[in-house]
Amino acid sequence: MKIDGPFYAQLSGAAGEARRLAQLGYDGVYTLEGSTDPFLPLVLAAEHAPGLDLATGIAVAFPRNPLHLAYQAWDLQKFSQGRFMLGIGSQVKAHIEKRFGVEFNPPAARMRDYI
């Protein structure tokens, strides 16, 4: 069985936190899109904890350009030597409209087009 855990580290402490979680025996870490970018801490985890699997759980899709997101995911996948898994989601209407300033549309059909 593999054990993954949330990776809440601020960017300035991400390298050390990734090493600490690897030493504790975690197999992987995932970031959440809260008050920080979900990708940048994973770059540092990829570099400083080469045994950890990495994931976004989740990155909000619709405020991002699909091509830009694909580049970010591909670059992180290459940099981590295949240890990255992209998790994307739609988020709720209030967050999409108020936090990100993007029009909310029914997410299922839009996500299909996005992917």
Question: How should each PLM-predicted stretch be described?
Answer:
Residues 1-56:
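N-terminal beta1-alpha1-beta2 module of alpha/beta enzyme domains
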Residues 2-8, 63-115:
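Flexible, glycine-rich active-site loops centered on histidine and acidic residues
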Residues 27-30, 61, 103:
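Residue-level detector of alpha-helix boundaries and kinks
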Residues 33, 58, 88-90:
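Short secondary-structure boundary segments
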Residues 33-37, 54, 61-68, 110:
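Generic, well-ordered alpha-helical segments
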Residues 53-59, 85-86:
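A short, GP-enriched loop/loop-strand-helix hinge that lies immediately N-terminal to
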